[in-house]
C-alpha cells in the first residue's frame, strides 16, 4: 500500500563518532535510525541502521552545533533531504521506501533484525539510480581536537 509523499533527511552527525541519522516523517514525528556508515547507493552494500527514539519533525531541518553534555552533542549538517514514499511493512519486518532526494534517489529496503534488537539494515535496491561506485563523502572533516570537542571545517 502506497502512502503520500512525506519528508526525509539524512543528517551527518559528528558526535563522539561520525555517523548519519536517517529521519522519516511519519504520524507527526521523525522516525529515526543512526547509521554508523551512512547509506549507500550501491545495491551490493548493506549498512547497519540502529533504531533510535522518534524525534520532533523540526529535526528534519535542524543544522548546527549541540553543546557538549546534551543528547546528540556535536555538529549536525543535512547531507541530503527530500521526499519519500513508503510501502507497508511486510511480515519479515521490512520497510520499502522510495527516496526522492538530491543525492539519495530510488528504492531502499530497511529490514529489521528479528527479536527485540534495535538493529535494522538498509540496502539500496537495484534500479536506475543504483551506483556501484558510490562513495559517501562527509560534508565536514575534523581539523583539530581540543579535548573531546572537535572543530570542523566544510570540505
Name every feature range the model reports, one short phrase each.
Residues 1-155:
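A charge-rich, low-complexity, intrinsically flexible signal that marks solvent-exposed coils, linkers
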